[in-house]
Amino acid sequence: MPDRGGGPPTGPRIRVGRPSRRVRTLLLTLGVLAVLAMAFTMFAGFWTDWLWYRSVHYSSVFTTTLWTKIGLFFVFGLLMALAVGFNIWLAHRLRPPLSAMSMEQQNLDRYRMGIAPYKKWLLLGITALVGLIAGASASGQWRTWLMWVNGVPFGQKDPQFKLDVSFYAFDLPWYRFLLGFGFAAVIISVIAAALTHYLYGGLRVTSPGARATAAATGHLSVLLGVFVALKAVAYWLDRYGLAVKSSDFKATDNWTGLRYVDANAYLPAKTILFCIAVICALLFFATLWRRTWQLPVIGFGLMVLSAILIGGLYPALVQKFQVQPNEQAKEAPYVEKNLAATRDAYGIEGTQVAEYPGKSETKDKTKLRDDADAAASVRIMDPNIISPTFQQLQQMRNYYAFPTNLDVDRYAKDGKDQDTVIGLRELNLAGIPKKNWINNHFRYTHGYGVVAAKGTQVDSEGRPVFTESNLPSEGDLGKYEQRIYYGEKTTTYSIVGGPQKEIDYSDDTGEKTFSYKGDGGVDLSNPINRAAYAAAFSEPQILYSGAIGDGSRILYNRTPKERVEAVAPWLTIDGDAYPAVVDGRIQWIVDAYTTTNGYPYASRTTLGDTTADSLTANNNSRAVVAQQNQVNYIRNSVKATVDAYSGDVKLYEWDTQDPVLKTWKKAFPGTVQDKGEISKELMAHLRYPQDLFKVQRELLTRYHVKDANTFLSGSEVWQVPDDPTNKSGDAVPPYYLSMKMPDQKAQAFSLTTTFTPNGRDNLSAFMAVDAEAGTSDYGKIRILKLPTSTTVDGPKQVQSQFNSEQDIAESIRLLRGGDSEVEYGNLLTVPLDGGLLYVEPVYVRGGDLKYPLLRKVLVSYGGNTAFENTLDAALNKVFGAQAAETEQPPDEGDDTTEPPPTSTNPTVREALSDAQKAFDAGQKALEQKDLAAYAEAQKDLEEALQRAEDAQAKADQGAGGKNGDDKNAGDKNSGDKAGSDKAGPDATPTGDAGGGADTG
């Protein structure tokens, strides 16, 4: 019969006693080891951070932030612990004597008896917990504290309260933090005190008689009085907060500042509520003498009712019956304040807006053609498309790579600046032959060399004209340190300088090795350092590997942006760091901003959204992804450099008038160098930053107007057009371009964009900023505003026109033959003699090609469109005239003109002649739309060009080496077959694709 549990146990009893001594010792040892491991891991994080900051010579940043956080943690943690602990202790001390116990008190007595032996420990535990939480929260306010302590006046006052802007930017955030801390301390104290009073009989719920003792009533009323007093302070600060309050307003998104209803309803309401709250607080304090809740409850109810009626209903009535019937007249004075403040806060107050006809009245076609060359050095090398071309022609080894988006800079040649597309041959660990810990972190440690090409020219095959190429790199840039230990693609750590040799680069003779000799990184000779990094990187081999020895240094935090962010955590970093060769070193140049969201009356914007465009959508490294907080003041106050070899970070003051930068310089003295320390060579490569320009252009879609009524009507609202060459629907990116605005006498390196009317595609304005640092006009924004009475095609319409013209569409279809892919380059806009010139390079990536080559150039002006092999030819066709003949100086290494017939090698001459014949035959077939003949001609062209290149290479070797043309064209060092470079359709053996001053 089964056991029902009612009888005595039938089996042997199992004794559960204390663990044996050995088990207890083992458990204790494991516990101690676990605690030590956790402690050492925490120490390792702290110690490695300290070593890193010391290695980059910014240890003061580490110590300042550390001590500030520690100070805030202990001060506010202690204040919170004392406030809560004191009120718990006081509530316990004020407990009533227990006599006749009700059922409620009998139930509570069990809890009182249970915690009696642990009261002190419980009190310490509660106060420690709330203190830790409060201290951790306060330590996160270290920026707010430093800005309040070191705040520098702006020298400008808000139009409502006549207070310096620094009050809103530096003081008000700290006061609000203190207020929030006070509320938290009081609320927690009230809850803790009420629970203690209830536990010990000071408050009763079901017991007969008074619900609260006099002592409990007095204690809680004082706490509630403090709470209401803090609410009075909050009402008073809210008055000033109206100047930086965001609200919905039809005139603009993210409106900031007072409007009519704020100044005439909310502002007096806040003042009245402040007075009521003060009276209510006094009534709560009065219960110490009156011992009754009647008056405080009445006062508190009055305050709540007033908040609803005066703070909510009254402003709504003012808005409904005073503002809405006559909104334009009521809001106009406040809109004027917002216009002035926003334009000043974003640095757009000096924007020069000029009327521009949009259509040329010039009848002289020859003049138009000549002016087109003078108006801009049109960049037909799109840095956002030709990275695969750099990769194929100049990668050299699989463990090198170029960035997805190349950069545009200026380099002087023969005393003249030329727009240059530049990229670094960085390390690509994904391409190393064999992956293991030694290869990943010891042997393959750095990239090698700069590759640069002219932005305005291509060679006869549509490839870049390299001004710096090969491995090691050689060309116009001269001698410089080519090793790249710090770059945008270098995201893992490397250990260098020790017994293990590094792969430097490879050539035809084999691999070259190298050992790092710089002072970058942290020394690993110390075993404590090795143990700390082994723990920090979760890699025990760092501790015991024989590949680490005397002189070994660990390099990490190697991208330019993260290095600048680490040494200047108070700066906002631009999304695009770019390289430049400066004083014999490769320097990464990083633009950095100071921001605040406390500029009164200035509308806010979100950097992460405002700076997004068609480039950042597909390349997160270019986006300001961390900046989703809103700001309403921004300055490009710092230019930073990061040495690609040593990793040295230098911060240079750029905006010498910025009060936010002055504040941070006081907080971190010695971290930012004076503007005068910028060398002349570095100054030549500084430029106007893209992200600041994108923020400003977004604001200028509305804030280009200065009249309040026009602003309110929204009749002149613009928008940044979508990128017409991209189907993503993202905004068109701004473009760097050497060009000339109507009021300029010569071309200037500029950053440009276009605007269209809101919801429409025609052009409404063109905007350019002088981007060349060191010039008197640097940062000057010019807007050409087109008349609303005439319609000028915008970028999307021009692109549609390109695609819809029958001849162009047919040519594009032919170019797409044979599995080829057509890619449209940047659609550039250039003001020209009252009209607007559009230029768009067209690239073809053949079915058997891995990279795009320039094949055609689209040009549009005044409704006329051309689709030709070269920019010159397209301009000639659009204007119906040729440019005036100008003598071009010889440019060594240029392969942009017709293949020279001066070769003494008959094989070369014969091959070039055959190539020209094949090219002519292909063009004729293209015009006749004979695909079969066109394909045959392209095959003949490829064979002829291959024969010419092979013959020329043999001739060069016989003469003692390769010539400059081979270098610029990208020779066999790229590892690809030369014939594949010409396999794309419509290869052009003659003509120059360049334009402007560099065309020939």
Curated annotation (Swiss-Prot):
Compositionally biased spans, kind Basic and acidic residues: 943-953, 963-984
Keyword terms of this UniProt record: Cell membrane, Membrane, Transmembrane, Transmembrane helix
Stretches that traverse the bilayer: 26-48, 70-92, 121-143, 177-199, 220-237, 267-289, 296-318
One Pfam family recorded for the sequence: UPF0182
Segments of this protein annotated with the region Disordered: 884-908, 943-1000
Compositional bias annotation for Acidic residues: 888-897
Subcellular localization(s) per the UniProt record: Cell membrane
Primary localization: membrane
Membrane topology: Multi-pass membrane protein
Gene Ontology annotations for the cellular component aspect, listed alphabetically: plasma membrane
InterPro entries assigned: UPF0182
Family: Belongs to the UPF0182 family.
Name used for this protein in its record: UPF0182 protein SCO5204
Lineage: Bacteria, Bacillati, Actinomycetota, Actinomycetes, Kitasatosporales
